[in-house]
């Protein structure tokens, strides 16, 4: 079982959504990224080059959220997961994109999608929701 690195609660303004008002006004998205990676070398060597740089993770994730508008947060989550999986040291990733200001007329606390990718079956392959 691999170690885990987590980036939780990254808040970035974006213009994603199907409705014109979402794209015109924008809204805050909250993103959680969990990646499974062997951190033994990083721990032993105390060297940033031996781990996944979480500053880069936050910056690239924020750039995707703030970047070109997408209709679906499923697409946004997939783009984040795919760039994380570009690093061959990563065994798997889970990306949660929260859209707490979604245009839903009923009162709600959150709406989110969870995108998971794993090396099982090849780069960027989807894995079942039951676990990594």
Swiss-Prot record:
Listed pathway(s): Cofactor biosynthesis; tetrahydrofolate biosynthesis; 2-amino-4-hydroxy-6-hydroxymethyl-7,8-dihydropteridine diphosphate from 7,8-dihydroneopterin triphosphate: step 3/4
EC number: 4.1.2.25, 5.1.99.8, 1.13.11.81
Record's catalysed reaction(s): 7,8-dihydroneopterin = 6-hydroxymethyl-7,8-dihydropterin + glycolaldehyde; 7,8-dihydroneopterin = 7,8-dihydromonapterin; 7,8-dihydroneopterin + O2 = 7,8-dihydroxanthopterin + glycolaldehyde + formate + H(+)
Cited InterPro entries: Dihydroneopterin_aldolase, FolB_dom, GTP-CH-I_C/QueF
Residue positions binding substrate: 22, 54, 73-74
SUPFAM superfamilies (alphabetical): Tetrahydrobiopterin biosynthesis enzymes-like
GO molecular function terms attached to this record: dihydroneopterin aldolase activity; isomerase activity; oxidoreductase activity
Active-site residues, as the UniProt record annotates them: 99 (proton donor/acceptor)
Example of a GO cellular component annotation carried by this entry: cytoplasm
This protein's UniProt keywords: Folate biosynthesis, Isomerase, Lyase, Oxidoreductase
GO process annotations (BP): folic acid biosynthetic process; tetrahydrofolate biosynthetic process
Family the entry assigns: Belongs to the DHNA family.
Function: Catalyzes the conversion of 7,8-dihydroneopterin to 6-hydroxymethyl-7,8-dihydropterin, 7,8-dihydromonapterin and 7,8-dihydroxanthopterin, respectively, in equal quantities. After longer incubation times the only product is 6-hydroxymethyl-7,8-dihydropterin.
PANTHER family from the UniProt entry: DIHYDRONEOPTERIN ALDOLASE 1-RELATED (PTHR42844:SF1)
Protein name as annotated: Dihydroneopterin aldolase
Organism: Mycobacterium leprae (strain TN)
């Amino acid at each position: 079982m691999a170690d885990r690195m987590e980036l939780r609660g990254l808040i970035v303004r974006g213009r994603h959504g199907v409705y014109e008002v979402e794209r015109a006004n924008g809204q805050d998205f909250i993103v959680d990224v969990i990646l499974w990676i062997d951190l033994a070398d990083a721990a032993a060597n105390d060297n940033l080059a031996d781990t996944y740089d979480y500053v880069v993770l936050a910056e690239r994730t924020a750039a995707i959220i703030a970047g070109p508008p997408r209709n679906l947060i499923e697409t946004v989550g997939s783009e984040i997961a795919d760039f994380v999986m570009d690093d061959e040291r990563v065994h798997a990733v889970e990306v949660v994109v929260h859209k707490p200001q979604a245009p839903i007329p009923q009162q709600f606390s959150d709406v989110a999608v969870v995108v998971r990718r794993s090396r099982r079956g090849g780069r960027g392959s989807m894995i079942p929701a039951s676990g990594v």
